[in-house]
UniProtKB/Swiss-Prot annotation:
Belongs to the transferase hexapeptide repeat family. LpxD subfamily. Disulfide bonds: none annotated. GO terms for molecular function: N-acyltransferase activity. This is UDP-3-O-acylglucosamine N-acyltransferase. The keyword Lipid metabolism applies. It is an enzyme of class 2 (transferase). It comes from Xanthomonas oryzae pv. oryzae (strain MAFF 311018). Its EC number is 2.3.1.191. GO terms for biological process: lipid A biosynthetic process. InterPro entries: Hexapep (IPR001451), LpxD (IPR007691), Trimer_LpxA-like_sf (IPR011004), UDP_GlcNAc_AcTrfase_non-rep (IPR020573). The keyword Acyltransferase applies. The lineage of its organism: Bacteria, Pseudomonadati, Pseudomonadota, Gammaproteobacteria, Lysobacterales. Pfam families: Hexapep, LpxD. Catalyzes the N-acylation of UDP-3-O-acylglucosamine using 3-hydroxyacyl-ACP as the acyl donor. Is involved in the biosynthesis of lipid A, a phosphorylated glycolipid that anchors the lipopolysaccharide to the outer membrane of the cell.
Length: 337
């Protein structure tokens, strides 16, 4: 596919600087773009690459336009504009409607004639798959699940039981949704299992990364509101609620019954303690541990910054002495009084 710079600008409301007839057939980074490829400049860190870039077209802010040596598309947010343009060149494999002969469909399940069910898929009792859905190879949909219109399960996705997906949900390979929550009670020195009788509800336009696990609730449902984005290898425990338009980066873990507000961002490897609440529009930086509820929007961090090992070891040793040192300082202050 080839598009002119003018056609792209018209579709996304951008301003053309230079030759609007320049053709684009693909996208690439500034450093590696070549003839016929479009790139973007969003982070000032990469501004030095602009002068040497061989990109046919560059999406950038007005402030950077003078440095562009070829055709440019001016956008308020170059990264968002680039994401929309790149989608034009992301040609997905077309899956024709139909059920593969190797798939198993329970007699009580309902599968839309417009859905695609791939090889070795299993769909359990009373489950429903909507129009335009794609169920990838080897996926398992257990009993009493709903996959609403336009949703896609890539290869080997598991919906255990009582999982309800909204419209246009996308789940990547290996994800497990609706497994038992980690509910245990101690009885006479032995653990007994607390039945997990709830389900999982995932709203419209959510995306779940590869090998992520979202457990079903004990009594009520675990809920992801609409347009939540979850990266790979994330654990969301039972009875959590994730607010709309929030995003959670890889290797994060959210303990049971935690509530995260709308438009929140969690960096990689963030830990959230159970039974607390995070308000709307909170950013938690990577490797942080959230031990208390957060009631004010803003950016929060925890942990020790990276330093050379020798300095870190000295500081770690001093950390153990903080209480003793603090008591000495207080004692000196009282003596001076």
């Amino acid at each position: 596919m080839r598009l002119t710079a003018s056609a792209i600008a018209g579709q996304f409301g951008l301003t053309v600087l230079g030759d609007g007839s320049t053709e684009v057939s693909g996208v690439a980074t500034l450093a590696h773009a070549g003839a016929g490829q479009l790139s973007f400049l969003s982070n000032p860190r990469y501004r030095p690459q602009l002068a040497d870039s061989q990109a046919a077209v560059v999406v950038l802010r007005a402030d950077d336009a003078e440095a562009a040596k070829g055709t440019a598309l001016v956008a308020k947010d170059p990264y968002t504009a680039f994401a929309k343009i790149a989608a034009l060149f992301d040609v997905a494999q077309v899956c024709e409607p139909g059920i593969h002969p190797s798939a198993f469909i329970d007699p009580t399940a309902q599968v839309s004639p417009g859905a695609h069910v791939g090889p070795f898929v299993s769909i359990g009792a009373r489950s429903r798959v909507g129009d335009g859905c794609v169920i990838g190879t080897g996926s398992l949909i257990g009993a009493d699940c709903v996959v609403d219109d336009g949703s896609e399960l890539l290869a080997r996705v598991t919906l255990v039981t009582r999982v309800r997906l909204g419209k246009r949900v996308r789940i990547h390979p290996g994800a497990v949704i609706g497994a038992d929550g980690f509910g245990l009670a101690m009885d006479a020195g032995h653990w007994i299992k607390v039945p997990q009788l709830g389900g999982v509800v995932i709203g419209d336009d959510c995306e779940i990364g590869a090998n992520t696990c979202i457990d079903r609730g004990a009594l009520e449902d675990t809920v992801l509101e609409e347009d939540v984005r979850v990266d790979n290898l994330v654990q969301i425990a039972h009875n959590c609620r994730i607010g709309a338009h929030s995003a959670i980066a890889g290797c994060s873990g959210i303990a049971g019954s935690a509530k995260i507000g709308r438009y929140c961002l969690l960096g990689g490897h963030v830990g959230v303690v159970g039974h607390l609440e995070i308000c709307d529009k909170v950013v938690i930086t990577g490797k942080s541990v959230v031990r208390n509820s957060i009631n004010e929007p803003g950016e929060y961090s925890s942990g020790t910054p990276l330093t050379d090992n020798r300095t870190w070891r000295k500081n770690a040793a001093r950390f153990k002495q903080l209480d003793v040192l603090a008591r000495r300082i207080l004692a000196v202050g009282k003596e001076k009084e």
